[in-house]
């Protein structure tokens, strides 16, 4: 029992001690952790004082290397297993059992530990380097507080003396540094090897002998030839220097050849330069040539048109001078027109009008002429003819006053008024009569009454096709195309009364005196015929008779007469409507100029486009 009690007491005491030790250890560790958290420098110092197990392994490996070095010094013979690389040795050391690791004595272990501790003191940051991963930035591996340079690491002298690092990149058979030197020293030429070398050299000499002799002969011949040439040239140079004064002597043939070559080169260079200059001139002059071509073409066209117009004018002047005009007014007006010299500007205007209006120059001049008639057999002119009854005039005729005038045919079959495609080409508010009035000419419709169905002998006249630059004047239409229409028109106006003629004449004279009833856009001037005193007396009598008749008529009939009078041509003296004509002429002139400018711009663009297409 006593033994059991003592056993329990001992166990209890041991438990108490154990609990006390654990409590003290925990308290100490708690205090230490608090200190380490507050002061990290102290933690580093404590860590650096104790060697890590990796450091101990490294020290063991170093000691083994040292022992191997001592063994190599004692036994210089070659060890084939000595050339194993460092990682293989580390593997072998790691594979060794613990019993072999513990084979070291206690004194050696103490020495190793002391050296490790000294090394840890000298290198305070070595443990941090081993524990932390390696980074590219070397500044982060070394703290800023470190006063010593990393190159001032002091290794033990004994360790530096005895450390032998095996080469990593050589073969295992050459790991021993003494091997090659020993082989070189031990190698010696034997008499057998010397004999073989001599025989090899002799055979090589036999093979290369004849070739060398041939080469030597060729070299000797060349040397002799060059020596002879040098002697000849030296003599020539000496003689030439005496004459010329020290200049190099060259044969005459070489000089001639060099001169000819230089001349050929100069001529080639000059030819190339001239070709380049010509190409540049052609390139620069292409645009100028195009402009010149355009100008020449325009001038040629103008000259052709001018020649045609002048030739036709000459023919007309000759016809006027030879023939006698039945109408005195028309002859006087024609003489006045052709007595004035035509300037170039008016001719160009006539040409532009003939192009833009698509009217031949002959018909355009007929419109400008006053009273010339192409044929001698001309029927006498008739007076103004008015229908018997005013109701017979249809609304179509009233709305289109120029209907009969447009249907008249010229001597060549062209209408003298813009009743065809000409009016479509002209802008609004313009007519051929307005353009001719601007030019200072009188229209043929103003000098001849528009209602003359039998003006010419139509049996002798044939119409002509519309004007075009590519059409021949010989293309003519048959008579049956237009003769029935003319006969119908002639029959329509055969049944006119004398009273209606007198009434029409009187209305025309009244409208001359009172022009305000007429529309300004439809004013058409007809020259008043020169009347004698007898005519004036007759007119006065007619006026009185018509006034009495007008008083008897109702207001409706007077309105109808006024409408008819608007459609009839009116004789307006130049002295009465001079201011109105001035304003009308100015407006019409602006319209004509705008129209001509537009036509010129369009034609110029078309011409340039055609030229560009041709050049392409």
UniProtKB/Swiss-Prot annotation:
One of its GO terms (molecular function) is cytokine activity. The gene is SCG2. Pfam families: Granin. Binds calcium with a low-affinity. PROSITE patterns: GRANINS_1 (PS00422). Keywords: Calcium, Cleavage on pair of basic residues, Phosphoprotein, Secreted, Signal, Sulfation. Residues 92-104, 255-283, 548-560 have a biased composition (Basic and acidic residues). This is Secretogranin-2. Residues 28-30 form a propeptide. Interacts with Secretogranin III/SCG3. Neuroendocrine protein of the granin family that regulates the biogenesis of secretory granules. One of its GO terms (biological process) is eosinophil chemotaxis. The modification Sulfotyrosine is found at residue 150. GO terms for cellular component: extracellular space; secretory granule. The keyword Ligase does not apply. Residues 122-140 have a biased composition (Polar residues). InterPro entries: Chromogranin_CS, Granin, ScgII. The modification Phosphoserine is found at residues 173, 267, 431, 531, 554-555. The keyword S-adenosyl-L-methionine does not apply. Disulfide bonds: none annotated. Belongs to the chromogranin/secretogranin protein family. Residues 1-27 form the signal peptide.
